Design a protein with these regions (language model features):
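Acidic-glycine-rich active-site phosphate/pyrophosphate-binding loop
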Residues: 1, 25-44, 105-111
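Polybasic, low-complexity association/targeting segments
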Residues: 1-14
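Short acidic alpha-helix initiation/capping motifs at coil-to-helix transition points
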Residues: 16-22
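Short cysteine clusters
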Residues: 20, 56, 104
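Phosphate-handling active-site elements
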Residues: 31-41, 68-87
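Transmembrane alpha-helix interface/packing and boundary motifs in multi-pass membrane proteins
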Residues: 45-53
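DPxDG-like acidic metal-binding loop motif
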Residues: 61-69
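C-terminal binding/interaction regions
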Residues: 84-149
Length: 149
């Protein structure tokens, strides 16, 4: 699946009423191994910054995808944990660089949010949908760099 197709899929999930985290996680079932339903169930509380304005559900879902692609387990010990930490910090850094915030409450207050190139190509204007599509595009770029896609 191309990055654009994955972004389109996440956007369609969001348009159908899924929250931001559900929309992102369900677009990566081929990487996580979760079914659509499992993805939706797992991320059902991610929307609205875990329903309290905290960390954006897009980020939470992307962290789950990274964890499934590059897990930290008892088997891989401290090295797995170190890699997991580095990947999460790298994704957060990229998100912060683009949107200047990590928390839903602050992201929703921003009036000059500009999406990534695919978000612009798809004509996304809905605030949270911009986060969904842009987050998927950023994660795909990161996974491609890591050769997981």
């Amino acid at each position: 699946m191309t990055t654009r197709e994955r972004c389109q899929k996440a956007m369609e999930y969001h348009e159908k009423g899924l929250n931001c985290g559900q929309s992102v996680l369900a677009a990566f079932t081929d990487i996580t191994g979760f079914t659509e339903e499992q993805s939706m169930a797992l991320a059902s509380g991610f929307g609205g910054g875990m329903r309290c304005g905290g960390v954006c559900g897009v980020i939470s879902a992307c962290v789950v995808v990274l964890g499934m692609a590059y897990p930290s387990t008892l088997e891989n010990g401290p090295e797995g944990k170190k890699r997991s930490t580095q990947l999460v910090k790298e994704f957060q850094s990229r998100f912060l660089q683009r949107f200047h915030q990590l928390n839903c409450h602050e992201l929703l207050a921003e009036s000059d949010i500009e999406g990534t190139s695919i978000a612009r190509e798809l004509g996304v204007t809905h605030h949270c949908r911009l986060m969904v599509v842009s987050g998927v595009e950023m994660l795909c770029g990161m996974l491609e760099e890591l050769e997981a896609l």
